[in-house]
Amino acid sequence: MTTTATQHFAQLLQKYGIDTVFGIVGIPIVQLADTMVANGIKFIPCRNEQAASYAASAYGYISDKPGVLLIVGGPGLIHALAGIYNSMSNRWPLLVIAGSSSQSDIHKGGFQELDQVSLLSPFLKFTGKLTPDNIDMITQKALNYCIQGTAGVSYIDVPADFIEYEKPLEGNDRTGNELPMILTPNICGPDPSKIKKVVQLILQHKNKNILIVIGKGAVKNSHEIRRLVNTFNLPFLPTPMAKGIVPDSSPLNVSSARSQALKIADIVLVLGARLNWILHFGTSPKWNSESIFIQFDSNPETLGDNNVSPGADLSIWGDIGLSVTALVEELTRQDSCWKYSGVKQEIREKIQLNQTRLLRKEKTRGAQLNYNQVYGTLRPLIDDYRTILVTEGANTMDIARISFPTDAPRRRLDAGTNATMGIGLGYALACKASHPELDVVLIQGDSAFGFSAMEIETAVRCQLALVIVVMNNSGIYHGEKDIEGDLPPTALSKNCRYDLVGKGLGANDFFVNTISELSRCFQQAVQLSRTKRETSVINVIIEPGEQKQIAFAWQNKPRL
């Protein structure tokens, strides 16, 4: 059997289970992209490296295998740093493949010359440059580093002379003989002695306020965490992208009384979440100043970070599923009859009050639509188990977090750890590519829409049927009622016709001003997605909003 270097590399990726690649082609990687397609790998050509990098990044999260990004070198790689950073911060597996100058042109000012290996190696888990002699080793190492330990980013540099190398690799069958073709993350269990100490602490404080905080790092461990919550009747609070790991519909979910739940928590089990800005660094005044945080994580660097409580010494390192199972078994062994009292009465009352307030807001009618009215209309139209909802934008995303509960994991994606704007269409493309059988609904603010609107054409061309809802308040945070004179930095053009942008790019266009129009258009868009694999853009005109000072609401204001 003979094959070229490029063919061998593409075949190797396919044998490792790589089925989808996002990117933008150019010199010298066009031939590599063609070879990937010839070997059964789906290539999704995007319109901008930033959006492509976000798509590949999210694919690594939503599909449970490394996302793969193929781009040109130099400026193409620089444009893709957004998604690389996104995967690093979110701890998602990503393989970046970029073209580079021929070896003979290095240090001569070659075409798009950039020493990409040196640029990236201090920050990524692995970087390597392909030669005809090291294809198997570099590919295996890159993919293995992506998934082992804390998931992250690997980089493979593909010089132009590698792609142009046409000499057959005689008898190159090493993929089946020397290196394993199935890459599985290794996991380890927790320290049994620490599990015993955690159980003793819980039972010693069983009359105190106990809370489980669930992060997206525990997304693979839904079964084990549901068992813990339900067996011992423990209240829980999911972080935004952890919604659905335990059903939001559970009576033990305290999300609707988040602020109060944090303030009264005494013992806090943190499962796969970081004590960062999303959890207010684990400090007062958001939290009870006496709270004891016990962190469970597969990443040892997370343990003890921002944790100044006595629980830092009890942090559990290991696979979260194995650790939670060990906790359940040890709790049962030490006290087989114990069951926590559940959600406190004061929290139940606050949940009821806030849910009533939310429903009242959704039913209050004004001269123009607002976020609450729109979300209250869309919620019953969304089939939870067959829908992935991506939300992006400041108010758009914040209000969506309380308006769209879910009972299934990996059904809610948003700006995440980095609070990144620009992820919306890339994430939506990844979700549809990974799960074509599901509805993918993207709800964006009008500012967020502008970051990657051209990717609508990608969705149309690749038949990645999306339902895109633009919450158009003509501004960032809020619009301006009076557009005369100098406009503030937050202002955008009033009532832009984003629906017509979608139409120009091949999507169905809907322009919405009323609840009845919204209901009809959304249902029509979903049907077009399911039956004809068509993308739709629904431009919803909403009120500009309050003209008030902009503050970091997540950090400074109570949440529902």
UniProtKB/Swiss-Prot annotation:
One GO-annotated biological process of the protein: fatty acid alpha-oxidation
Keywords: Cytoplasm, Lyase, Magnesium, Metal-binding, Peroxisome, Thiamine pyrophosphate
Major location category of this protein: cytoplasm
SUPFAM superfamilies in UniProt: DHS-like NAD/FAD-binding domain, Thiamin diphosphate-binding fold (THDP-binding)
CC cofactor: Mg(2+); thiamine diphosphate
Enzyme class: lyase
One CC-aspect GO term: peroxisome
Molecular-function GO terms, alphabetical: 2-hydroxyacyl-CoA lyase activity; carbon-carbon lyase activity; magnesium ion binding; thiamine pyrophosphate binding
Enzyme Commission number: 4.1.2.63
Cofactor note: Binds 1 Mg(2+) ion per subunit.
Residues that hold thiamine diphosphate according to the record: 49
A Pfam entry, by short name: TPP_enzyme_C
Motif (Peroxisomal target signal 1 (PTS1)): 558-560
Top-rank lineage group of the source organism: Eukaryota
Disruption phenotype: Does not affect growth on oleate.
Chain positions recorded as Mg(2+) binding sites: 446, 473
Location in the cell: Cytoplasm; Peroxisome matrix
Free-text comment about domains: Peroxisomal targeting signal 1 (PTS1) is a tripeptide located at the C-terminus of more than 95% of all peroxisomal matrix proteins. The prototypical PTS1 is the terminal tripeptide SKL (serine-lysine-leucine) but the consensus of PTS1 is defined as [S/A/H/C/E/P/Q/V] [K/R/H/Q] [L/F]. However, this description of the PTS1 consensus must probably be expanded beyond the terminal tripeptide.
Purpose of the protein: Catalyzes a carbon-carbon cleavage reaction; cleaves a 2-hydroxy-3-methylacyl-CoA into formyl-CoA and a 2-methyl-branched fatty aldehyde.
Similarity field: Belongs to the TPP enzyme family.
Protein name: 2-hydroxyacyl-CoA lyase
Organism annotation: Saccharomyces cerevisiae (strain ATCC 204508 / S288c) (Baker's yeast)
Name of encoding gene: PXP1
